[in-house]
């Protein structure tokens, strides 16, 4: 059973995922980026994780290594990509399966 989810997206989709997960009794996490430190979607989740500084080569919501690393570090048992970004990336699914 899923107990927690890292929402690897932003904006309205993150709000909708968080709302639904909360109704299901799942603890929700979102990432805060330096570009959007006060974004509305941050208040929709149970917890906010500051995204580590990047070198700018990989946009935050496309950085599979860091997203999977955050999920492991915070002992989050699932990762939801929302739509766009990593939602159609098979590598994300494989990395989640392997971790």
Segments (PLM) and residue ranges:
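ATP-binding N-terminal substructure of ATP-dependent carboxylate-amine bond-forming enzymes
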Residues: 1-99
């Amino acid at each position: 059973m899923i107990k927690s989810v890292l929402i690897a997206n932003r904006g309205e989709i993150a709000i909708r995922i968080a709302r639904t997960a909360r109704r299901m009794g799942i603890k929700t996490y979102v990432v805060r980026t330096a570009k959007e430190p006060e974004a509305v979607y941050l208040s929709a989740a149970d917890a906010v994780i500051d995204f580590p500084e990047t070198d700018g080569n990989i946009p935050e919501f496309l950085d599979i290594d860091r997203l999977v690393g955050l999920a492991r570090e915070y002992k989050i048992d699932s990762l939801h990509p929302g739509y766009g970004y990593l939602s159609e990336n098979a590598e994300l699914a494989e990395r989640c399966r392997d971790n």
